Amino acid sequence: MLRRELNNSISNRSIENESFPFERPNVSYIISAEFDNKLGPILKHQYPKDIPGFNQFSHEQRNGNTSVSMNLASLMIPSSIERNPGKQDITVFTLYYNKFTQNYQLFPVPKDPRFSFNLHHREQSDGSVTNSIYYDAENHQDAKNNRYTIVLEDDELECQEVQNNQKAIDNEPLFFINVANTVLDTTNDRGAVIKSIAIGTPLKTFFAFKNIIVLVLDLYMKAPTQAAATDILLDCFNMLNSIDLTLINDIHSKSSIQEVLHSIHDESIITKVFLDPDSTLKKLFCINGFDTKDKYGNIVTFHDQLIQYHFTRFQPKTLPPFLLKIPLQFNMIRREPIYIENDYNELVLKFLDKFVPYLLKAGQKVNAWKLVINSTKLSKEDLCAFILSLANITATYASDPQSYFKGNAALIFPYMDISLVDGLRAYVASNSDFVGCFAIIGTANPIFRYQLDIWDYYYDVDEGVFYENNSPEKEKPDTVAEVKIGPNPLRKIFNRPHFSTNAVNESQVNLGQKLFSLLIDEYHDSDTIMSVLRRLNVLQLENLLDALKRREIPPNIALKDEYIMFYKDFFIFPEFFDYFTLHSIELLSNLDNCLFSLGNTCQLFSTEQIYSQLSQILDIVKELFRMVSVSRTNIEKFLNACLNYSPFKILPTAQLHGDNISRWSFESEVRQGFDNFNSYMGIEKDPHGVIVSAIDLFTQIYSFDILAFFLTFITKESGQDLPFTKSLSRRRTYLTRIAQSSSLRQFLQLSTRPNIRILGGNGQGTGNSNYPEFTNASSVISPKLRASPLLERRASKICYAITKLLYRLECHPIGMALLKKYLHNQLREAYLESKRHFISKKGDSTNTSSTIASSSFAGASVPLSSNESGMLNGLKQINEQQESTLETTQKED
């Protein structure tokens, strides 16, 4: 191995290290590769040190096997890059840190640290790992060629402090974004020079570095000498680490508010958040000002949704000054776990439309699959972005805390070279955790199609064709061609194996497929597509919860696993499986159904029945107020639930599954449901309104109208002062009521009570066609309330509780904008009138009540499981803590 020791001039020139000590570097490694005409792709440089596990010197010293770095280099020099000289291409790969071997590797680390990926005995001075046996999947091949790597080591970076800082981040996966290019060169025997540069970072926003790396690669390839090329790498590494990204990392780490922003697709609200003079942005993210600096003194500016870091403190030694004028930009809205620039309609929707039928066909007998996606026409950047898009909608890439199915994450490999096939086989064979797991692998080589033992489904993007692996013994395809050709392994690769493109039964259709086809035909933007997928996830989750209540539930059921098995939609959004969000969705659904039941002209209720319904509505609203009063995070989670909830009047037949759903039209159902909803709410249809698509109607925000709808039941003419509000100002009385409304027994009755949907003879939710006419519910309910003082007092209490709930939401910067945008004019007027009546007169008591409500919910800190048994245990703990808090408060009084 060639080893270049940096002279003292590098240490003297690297004065940035004194100013920027890299406590937590933005970029952990910068590496380069090139294509050697004799050796193929090779690693050329690694900085600031060789990556653990990819140390060329140690491998050659042991056994001459250098395929580990060769496989890494093959990812950096992708196939066919020489076909487009002067046009850069991008690949993405991840290195996972193995705490047991203290090395990085290309495949995820097994849960059991005793099983890793290297058959070689490690000879290290560290007694904790000496003589440990591990299997290296990347090092599976016998490679006899020598590989040469220049390991750049800066003495100052090798100090103990830097080593400690490096160890602190070593346990995180490193995301590498790699830029490769080809430059024609007549002096080269190949006629061209192929080189690449990659940076490894623990940040999932690694695509933000793309533009800078592209420019640096151009300078690197034009460097007149090898020394100048290495200096460019050093300068780039120091420049990217000369800024402090704490601010954007903090903004992205606020998951609850990010989920709300992700669910907002109205540009006027986004503009309000980021550009309004009231500084909503400052309130949300606790930003002191729009003209600020990082801790190193670099200027940080804000532009629309972007935060821009300027390299104002860095002094380049080799890089040209113009490069420093390009700011590093990050979107403050973290729309996906991995930020990418991709067209979901072009690739992802077509994939879902083709793949979901195969999942439905497999049914519950297949709990795992391995998927290979191949394209020779897409650029590697588009291919990687496609695979990462699929990773985003399954939320299982790299260090994501959520699992996809039964506690296991999916293996996501954005781009895999053919040289890694044996490594993949070894990984699957040696990893017991992989049994029952999922894999999504991107390739640009059709040979993968014939490797039957590594895939269950193969998708040819270029041809738009899916292949299903039907071989009973995938590792031994018995083909006629094999008999004729013989056992030659090279020729055997091209045998046509047992796979098929069998058509899927058209009757196996779910709601997702109907939406996929409609989205493709109408060509909506990515925000609308993601909104539809999220709304569908919530809608089907709500129906699944209803179904689970009607049958016996296993004690250790995982709701997310049940959802994946039941709907087979591929995509999933874990934030909706949070207990608080689930409970919010359920309460919204119960409130929606109660209101519909009260205003339904097809049913006649006695005064007692109406009072019972009103009591249930009051319990629901009180429960919601108690929940959002706990913390700002709870408000944000509730707002996110509201933004993604669809009332069952819009799509009541969404709970149909299988054959039934194929016989109705999504468009006609949604349009009829929208008209019924407006009629029920008393909202007049605008004769001059713009005709919108069914998708736009489906993704409209209805929840805030549902919350405020009851306020219209108490007419202004009644004008009665509400005597009950006086008692609410007394601390003990209010606390007692809150505690009673949130007792475990009442909560379980509320949660397990069947939905109050009007059921048909078959027990299914009745469709829109069964209701030929929807009338304004206010005109039906208001006379009933005025006819009974008892009911009117009960209704007044509900109005007061609703007003407090809406006011609590309005106090949040985002909640204020959402209510202003999505509350219909008539309902907004009713809310403002109610707020003037209650809040302005009882401002002090409201604030006191809010504080008490927050303190009364002491169980907010209790972690709750998505399992049924775990959820019940968590609720019991909450109830016990609430009763304890109540007793303590009463003693103090």
UniProtKB/Swiss-Prot annotation:
Its main location: cytoplasm. Induction: Mainly expressed in dividing cells, but not in stationary phase cells (at protein level). One of its GO terms (cellular component) is nucleus. Residues 863-893 have a biased composition (Polar residues). Residues 841-893 are annotated as: Disordered. The keyword Nucleus does not apply. Residues 494-640 form the dDENN domain. GO terms for biological process: actin cortical patch localization; cellular bud site selection. Residues 25-488 are annotated as: Interaction with active ARF3. Pfam families: Afi1 (PF07792), SPA (PF08616). It is found in: Cytoplasm, Perinuclear region; Cytoplasm, Cell cortex. Belongs to the AFI1/mesA family. Interacts with ARF3 (in GTP-bound form). Interacts with CNM67. This is ARF3-interacting protein 1.
